[in-house]
Amino acid sequence: MRILLIATNRHRRLMSRMNAQPVPIGLAYIAGHLDPDRHQLKILDLMFSEDYLADTEQAVKEFQPEMVGISLRNLDNSSYMDPQWALPITKEVIDKVRSVTKAPIVCGGPAFSLLPKECFNYLEPDMGVAGDGGETFAQLAECIESGETHRNLPGMVYRDNGAVAFNGLAYSNFARPPRLDELDMARYEQSGFGIGIVTKLDDNFSHSMDANSDGNSWRVLRPIEDVVAEIQEMKDRFDLRKIFFIDSGFNVPLPHAKALCQSIIESDLKIHWNSYLAPVPAACDEEVLGLMKQAGSGLVIMKGVAGHDLEQEALSTRMEPVQEVCQRCDEAGIHYVISQFFGEPGWNVLPRPVVV
């Protein structure tokens, strides 16, 4: 079966200031889960497109897909200076695809997974996959090809008697590497914070994480040897040396972080990497920060306090762990930024200014 995957993200700057053109790594993982002996695959990445609707129409007409996957990466561009909603572009792409083919359209991606029913209603694809969709999308392709039912698959979003049905989030173990050969990797190497590699993922990012928690609390905890092997493959195939570890909190669990850094150092990978850091003082000791620096850490992003955390404690109190971790990063020579949102659900008072 001919399958066309389209990455619709076109936002090129973070907060309207920093150059950030992320590789559609989720779509690449989807592609990696498809059986190349059974399916002919084409990836259309609209990030660098001069005319994204014309390119979409041309790709559909030339490839004649029998199934189309659409990736929605962001809900907006995360800018307070020039806020832009991301869904209209994806909606335009879906409408353009539908105007030239009757192939079923399946929508997914990080943003779609945040609000699957709402995004489904607005975008109007034929089906959706919410969550880590590698295995589900591959199974869905088999169902479409064979004519079998797909409604029992995890993560599926579909319309049932006029109402949107949702099977809950799908989960993946990311057992297969991403397929990157149809992406402009040389151009992405020069854009943003690095090429994404999944290390571990939690359902929530919170600085209440246990520094020494075991792998049972993570929905994805990839073996260190698999992560190192993927880095090596990135270097060998694409000469890439700038990596972004897709991780809910690189330093938690602390033993895992230290072991990964040590493996990177011993493998002599010589990479420059960025990631998220959990603002947990117990997971930011001198040893792990030193290992991170030696392993090539260039920048860490710390997520601040969620609105629901403020019901019983003052913001200044909740920010104390962030302040402490920032001080330790300064001492270790690790650059950092703090990501803190205000006015989200759970905020019922306007906090006083806090100096970090």
Which residue stretches match the model-derived regions?
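Acidic, low-complexity intrinsically disordered segments
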Residues: 1-232, 237-239
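Structural beta-sheet core signal
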Residues: 5, 70, 107, 275, ...
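Residue-level marker for beta-strand->alpha-helix junctions and adjacent short loops that shape enzyme
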Residues: 10-11, 75, 112, 135, ...
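Charged helix-capping and loop-helix junction motifs
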Residues: 83-92, 258-259, 316-321, 352-355
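Catalytic cores of alpha/beta
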Residues: 116-122, 288, 345-356
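Short Asp/Glu-rich motifs
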Residues: 15, 53-54, 117, 254, ...
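Loop/helix-junction capping segments adjacent to catalytic residues or to phosphate/diphosphate-binding pockets
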Residues: 50, 113, 251-254, 282-283, ...
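Radical SAM [4Fe-4S] cluster-binding motif and immediate context
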Residues: 22, 177-335, 342
